[in-house]
């Protein structure tokens, strides 16, 4: 039996925290119970953090076997690494947040892609 949708905020780049994610989630997908968030965190090689989020609108993430979740998150990472953002099936945009849904390893991911608007500054030679 396939799992229900689970929400995955994906942070691209540095400079964001899980509190930023919670702020975004409150704006775009408010929980029915305030602050009832629980994460599985996966760090990727691409300067990206994937939070697999449990909130009251979705089933208990802990019931998904860790191995299945890991495979699905790897598949999600591969997709994000190989598909340009403009080619993702984005259904909703709000500021620097893009949202889309995709099914990987029997799990439907409701993905919030959070692209920070910071500019990285490098030292210049004078």
Curated annotation (Swiss-Prot):
Entry protein name: Putative gene 48 protein
């Amino acid at each position: 039996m396939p799992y229900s949708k689970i929400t995955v905020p994906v942070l691209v780049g540095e400079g964001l925290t899980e509190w930023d994610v919670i702020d975004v989630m409150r704006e775009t997908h408010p929980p029915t119970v305030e602050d009832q968030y629980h994460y599985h965190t996966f760090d990727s090689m691409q300067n990206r953090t994937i939070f697999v989020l449990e909130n009251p609108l979705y089933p208990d993430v802990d019931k998904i076997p860790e191995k299945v979740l890991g495979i699905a998150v790897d598949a999600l990472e591969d997709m994000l690494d190989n598909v340009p953002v403009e080619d993702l099936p984005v259904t909703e945009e709000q500021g620097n947040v893009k949202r889309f849904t995709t099914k990987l390893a029997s799990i439907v991911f409701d993905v919030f892609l959070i692209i920070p608007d910071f500019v990285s500054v490098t030292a210049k030679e004078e």
